[in-house]
Amino acid sequence: MKRQALAAMIASLFALAACGGEQAAQAPAETPAASAEAASSAAQATAETPAGELPVIDAVTTHAPEVPPAIDRDYPAKVRVKMETVEKTMKMDDGVEYRYWTFDGDVPGRMIRVREGDTVEVEFSNNPSSTVPHNVDFHAATGQGGGAAATFTAPGRTSTFSFKALQPGLYIYHCAVAPVGMHIANGMYGLILVEPKEGLPKVDKEFYIVQGDFYTKGKKGAQGLQPFDMDKAVAEQPEYVVFNGHVGSIAGDNALKAKAGETVRMYVGNGGPNLVSSFHVIGEIFDKVYVEGGKLINENVQSTIVPAGGSAIVEFKVDIPGSYTLVDHSIFRAFNKGALGQLKVEGAENPEIMTQKLSDTAYAGSGAASAPAASAPAASAPAASASEKSVY
């Protein structure tokens, strides 16, 4: 009896196992939608990884006009950024020097490139030779002061803080130690790009450009070392308005370079501290403008506003060779205060797009014969500046 019961029990177990195997064999394969949902869940889990468990990466940063390489990862990381404030005398213009206050030894400071969702850890050092404390306010950071209090650092000291890059865009960073305007006017600003998770479209060339206004005791061109003039700064009357900290920083031998047919992207900032820029490239139309460095895209734009403490991203294809002049189209700033740059483009001419001069003939004017004699001699126009002659 016991043997019969045991045999019956074993038979039932085999039957159950066979049934389970049959059910497993009949289970449907995972659908693409389910796979995508699983991948999305995994990505969400990665995005929510505590900062202490993220992979650690040292940021690749660049001096203007160079741009750090595009982000090629699809996950967040802890990105370490080292910054040093340095006060140093450098050339402002031919024969003119200025005592700049800088991030990492030049104006603008290095460009930083991170990914949306990254945790940015900033190691902020103030060179022992500095005369005053410095700090940094990241417009890309969410939280009081943008990190200014956390990075307030005396000469010869190092401070560390971190923030999460929550929103993609192109953002200014600047010193925010009082008097804030003076620190910015002396050159303490730069750009940080927070790439969207999906990245930016690939282009052929990228450049980093920041406009700034400078307030010197002497007038533009006055020789020697020029001190900062607070009265001119408060009155918003700069002697110099320049790209990348110096007259001619991206012109002549320092001109930006591209080839006909290439698409160019410019990351444009405005450190200010006072003036709003009307950024324009003479002879080009911006195919795309990421308005104020954000998500909104405008198309077919001739000039774009870049506010003080703000930015814009502009893209355009250069169709034909030539020297394309970058200006603040508040035009006296370009030809009389220094806001000029050059993009030199090589390649084959294309007369379908634009020809050279086809003719040059005499013209007497439609009303020349009956025009009355002038009652007074006409005032002569001032001679064109050297920069105007080189542009037009």
Swiss-Prot record:
UniProt region (4 X 5 AA tandem repeats of A-A-S-A-P), positions on chain: 368-387
Top EC category: oxidoreductase
Predominant location category: membrane
Cofactor: how bound: Binds 1 Cu(+) ion.
Membrane topology recorded in Swiss-Prot or TrEMBL: Lipid-anchor
Keyword Lipoprotein: yes
Entry protein name: Copper-containing nitrite reductase
Gene for this chain: aniA
